[in-house]
Amino acid sequence: MLYNVSIMVNLWSALASRDVRLLKNQIDKLNSLPENCWFVNYLRCHDDIGWGLDEDVERYLDIDPLKHKEFLYHFYEGATPGSWSMGELYNYDEATRDARSCGTTASLCGIEQALDKNDKIALDYAVKRDLLLHTAMAFLQG
C-alpha cells in the first residue's frame, strides 16, 4: 500500500487550472491497476505539496511543465489574479524555479480568505470546492 501523491497533486492542479485532463489521465491509470493494488488517497497531510506532475503527459497535452508548476505554486500562495488561496510558497529554488506549496485544505480552497474578508459568497464557493475534493476522495479507487 502506498500514499497516492499523484492523485493529490492532480486534484489540486485541476481545481486551480480548471483543466481536468491531467487528473483524468491519472484516474485512468489508477483504474487500470489490478484489484489487489491499494493506495491511501489524501488531499493534504503534514507535508508540503511537491508539484510532481507527469511531465511527459503534460507535454503530450501541450502543457508546458515548468509554466504549469509556476502557475500552481503562485496560485496557491495567492499571488495569481483570481486566486482564492492563502497557502505559502515553500523551498523556492531560483536556479530551477522549482517550489512547493504549504497550506491546509481550508486555506487552499479559499475558506481562510473568505472568512478574513467576511465574504459569504466566497465562503460558499470555498466550502463547495472543499466538498468537491472530499467527494472525489470518497469515490476514487484506493
What are these regions (language model features)?
Residues M1-G142:
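Active-site and adjacent substrate-binding regions of carbohydrate-active enzymes
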